[in-house]
Amino acid sequence: MNGPVDGLCDHSLSEEGAFMFTSESVGEGHPDKICDQISDAVLDAHLKQDPNAKVACETVCKTGMVLLCGEITSMAMVDYQRVVRETIQHIGYDDSAKGFDFKTCNVLVALEQQSPDIAQCVHLDRNEEDVGAGDQGLMFGYATDETEECMPLTIMLAHRLNARMAELRRSGQLPWLQPDSKTQVTVQYTQDNGAVIPMRVHTVVISVQHNEDITLEDMRRALKEQVIRAVVPARYLDEDTIYHLQPSGRFVIGGPQGDAGVTGRKIIVDTYGGWGAHGGGAFSGKDYTKVDRSAAYAARWVAKSLVKAGLCRRVLVQVSYAIGVAEPLSISIFTYGTSQKTERELLDVVNKNFDLRPGVIVRDLDLKKPIYQKTACYGHFGRSEFPWEVPKKLVF
């Protein structure tokens, strides 16, 4: 089951235009994801009381300790100890035997007010529609018609494998599972005039934290039968699919005990699994004035709307901003040759249908609601409960 890869697998890429692509995901108990979820839980706690809160909350976690640091200006009164501990409890670290315990961990708080230099140029004395970007930067949105969600199959499968393990852990069906997990999926694709079509799953990798009282053989069997076969459509699996299940052989020490965690270190997991492009800015712990988050959501909204409207089969949208300036500096569209329209024509469609000022994005996508903790695991995109995943009906 954990055999060597056969060279570069050239035998499976003999078809013209065939290639392989890999994406990874991590579970709720991965230390970096713990931090993302805590940062967004803090953001939600403020937005519940003050929808106009300005939040930039970073989290660090290590054995027995959580540190909150950042800048927050808000009318809300938030019990940070409670927010942190409830988040860790929900994730599943509720006993010191697991290496981390919400009841006994130390919570340190180093949060200050937002810099008045930033406030005066971004939102003070401005109408909401004219709120400036909270910083400079470039953001990307991507969409592809290879799945109903307009997401790459590689990242969707990787997320679903982690979600399935969390489901089996919480239901008690696989009681040996612990919260920390990682998955990785390699898919063999073929190209069709710039669009990509998944043909088969080439490799699946799963590493998950576990109890002492389970054999490696039993873990591998359960992961294949109850996780992979429940998630990956049978048409993508064949006798040549490679499985690396618990390849380290042992993963008892996990979560913050195994590795330190920091907010914002899983930006590719959070987005498109390496497809498209990334501007470098993380999402979690940031309110809508931080265009790292809001503009990336808007760019995804634009990209998915273009694909669902049939204007292209695959598209990458880039936007850029300057601090204190409301209007984006640039909007760029790349369709990989999958559109009957020129990219200039598509840009005209985007400009007629979307207003990408932060103060308008927040209104159109309802970004003052406390919805963010849900985004902080299993990806920010490809999930129908979020407003930016509902394609806009385009006028063109």
From Swiss-Prot:
Gene Ontology process terms (BP): methionine catabolic process; one-carbon metabolic process; S-adenosylmethionine biosynthetic process
EC number(s) stated in the UniProt entry for this protein: 2.5.1.6
Entries under HAMAP family matching the protein: S_AdoMet_synth1
Organism: Bos taurus
Keyword Nucleotide-binding on entry: yes
InterPro entries: ADOMET_SYNTHASE_CS, S-AdoMet_synt_C, S-AdoMet_synt_central, S-AdoMet_synt_N, S-AdoMet_synthetase, S-AdoMet_synthetase_sfam
Enzyme class, spelled out: transferase
Name this protein carries in UniProt: S-adenosylmethionine synthase isoform type-1
S-nitrosocysteine: residues carrying this PTM: C121
Protein family membership: Belongs to the AdoMet synthase family.
